[in-house]
Amino acid sequence: MNLRDNYPQPYTIHDARHWVEFNHKFNPAQNFAIEFEGKLAGAIGAERGKDELRTNMELGFWVGEPFWGKGIATEAVKLYTDYIFDKFDIQRIYAQVFDFNGESMNVLEKAGYIPEAILKKGFIKRGTVGDLFQYVKVRGED
């Protein structure tokens, strides 16, 4: 699975309810479900940096396998990026991607994000160390 380890696996209805309740406190909203043809297809959200990094937000998203290959993630990232720059005093949005997740790298590039850095041996997942690719979209740079 391409999600971070703190993401519940399997993801239960209890987990979904907790996520919805947790997100009610944000105004403006920071996290959204991704809907496609009336069905939950995934989720997208961002977390603001703290202190000196408060002009940054880290983007995260997922789309369920039945919805892959339909352009849903790319469209969601584009719309969400515009929303974040409109609603928040943010200068940059970045996303970190495991080296084995080429699909997410493609989504980010199609949505206008550019490769910014490779964090060599930047993560460990399922006992394997790998590189972490960082993509960025900077306000006003297209």
PLM feature spans:
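Conserved GNAT-fold acetyl-CoA-binding loop/helix
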Residues: 1-21
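Proline-rich low-complexity regions
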Residues: 8-10, 28, 74
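Short loop/turn motifs at secondary-structure junctions and domain boundaries
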Residues: 22-28, 113
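Acyl-donor (CoA/ACP) binding surface of acyl/acetyltransferases
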Residues: 31-142
